[in-house]
Amino acid sequence: MTIMRKSHPLMKIVNHAFIDLPTPPNISGWWNFGSLLGLCLILQIFTGLFLAMHYTSDTLTAFSSVTHICRDVNYGWLIRYLHANGASLFFMCLYIHIGRGIYYGSYLYMETWNIGILLLFLTMATAFMGYVLPWGQMSFWGATVITNLLSAMPYIGQDLVEWIWGGFSVDKATLTRFFALHFIMPFIITALVMVHLLFLHETGSNNPLGLPSDCGKVPFHPYYTTKDFMGVILLLTLFMTLVLFFPDKLGDPDNYTPANPLNTPPHIKPEWYFLFAYAILRSIPNKLGGVMALAFSILVLTLLPYLHTSKQRSLSFRPLSQTLFWMLISDVIALTWIGGQPVESPYIVIGQVASVLYFSIILIFMPIAGLIENKMLKL
């Protein structure tokens, strides 16, 4: 078998990626989330495939087909809730993965980091289109509000919105194309994940110290396969507890009402994993400004390699930057909370302050903290 995995063309690829891959000896549990994201992607593709076998992308029957899956299909309720809550699990792992990348300076691997940001955009687009498919109240109004934001673009905005809708409002054409795109996107994401891993394996993994670890690297198997397997068991235990005991905890009750274009819900909001960006969008009184702030809330991550001023890569030995990092995490949590609240005082002001703080920490305070820490090293 040893000869086979080192000589066979296909086995060689697997061997270099998952068995004999030289890995730093000191990477912590925060590095588990890459493999957990792979697990989430596989889970979403398989559950989505089985759901697509029974779903109909028609405005008259979409809601009924989801009900049919839950009531009449063998274990359909389980497949549906695995898929719906699997999206939440995916984003939880994704945000922790990005947070770890920021904390330990992994963004300095620029190709890997930028492909990761592209993956985040595609995953967000896929999740948004998936949320529209059950054709409940929040699905319909969420699709209407979010796609309508593109009309803020000068000159081409309204034409672009109508092109996406396939008509003059969100209707059958919109639902059909969203279903087609939602089905194909995970396979595009999978291809990009391969490229993400390719670039990562060119440089090797980062480690908590942010120092080169070439002299002490260990093979990925059995050390990190065992460690990743432990992470998988823990995560699946928590995930199955959520799916089997609290399947609707993260959903919106309005989505159990069929879509009605004549009745607007009192408070239109996306799923919890988009609320931080939604809060930033709402905090700008101008429509175009809000859309630009929404896009920049993710695009700002591409600037991190250029804003890195410290002589140290990781935040492990940088108390000032650590404080700012945890302030940023607290701010994102506050924005998530604000995004779920109605547009009224005091939530409007809190959202605006939190939005300004979000961009200030990333663009101003963290680069300044890096320069101050460089000065402190010379004392």
From Swiss-Prot:
PROSITE patterns: CYTB_CTER, CYTB_NTER
Hydrolase as UniProt keyword: no
Cofactor binding, per record: Binds 2 heme b groups non-covalently.
Assigned keywords, A-Z: Electron transport, Heme, Iron, Membrane, Metal-binding, Mitochondrion, Mitochondrion inner membrane, Respiratory chain, Transmembrane, Transmembrane helix, Transport, Ubiquinone
UniProt cross-references to InterPro entries, sorted A to Z: Cyt_b/b6_C, Cyt_b/b6_C_sf, Cyt_b/b6_N, Cytb/b6-like_sf, Cytochrome_b, Cytochrome_b_C_euk/bac, Cytochrome_b_N_euk/bac, Di-haem_cyt_TM
Cofactor(s) named in the record: heme b
Domain of life: Eukaryota
TM regions (residue ranges): 33-53, 77-98, 113-133, 178-198, 226-246, 288-308, 320-340, 347-367
Localization (cell): Mitochondrion inner membrane
Pfam families named among the record's database cross-references: Cytochrom_B_C, Cytochrome_B
Annotated positions binding a ubiquinone: 201
Positions annotated to bind heme b b562: 83, 182
Membrane topology value: Multi-pass membrane protein
Positions contributing to heme b b566 binding: 97, 196
Molecular function terms, GO-annotated: metal ion binding; ubiquinol-cytochrome-c reductase activity
GO annotation, cellular component aspect: mitochondrial inner membrane; respiratory chain complex III
The keyword Nuclease is assigned to this record: no
GO biological process terms on file: mitochondrial electron transport, ubiquinol to cytochrome c
Function field: Component of the ubiquinol-cytochrome c reductase complex (complex III or cytochrome b-c1 complex) that is part of the mitochondrial respiratory chain. The b-c1 complex mediates electron transfer from ubiquinol to cytochrome c. Contributes to the generation of a proton gradient across the mitochondrial membrane that is then used for ATP synthesis.
Complex and partners: The cytochrome bc1 complex contains 11 subunits: 3 respiratory subunits (MT-CYB, CYC1 and UQCRFS1), 2 core proteins (UQCRC1 and UQCRC2) and 6 low-molecular weight proteins (UQCRH/QCR6, UQCRB/QCR7, UQCRQ/QCR8, UQCR10/QCR9, UQCR11/QCR10 and a cleavage product of UQCRFS1). This cytochrome bc1 complex then forms a dimer.
Protein name as catalogued: Cytochrome b
Record organism: Cratogeomys goldmani goldmani
UniProt lineage: Eukaryota, Metazoa, Chordata, Craniata, Vertebrata
Protein encoded by which gene: MT-CYB
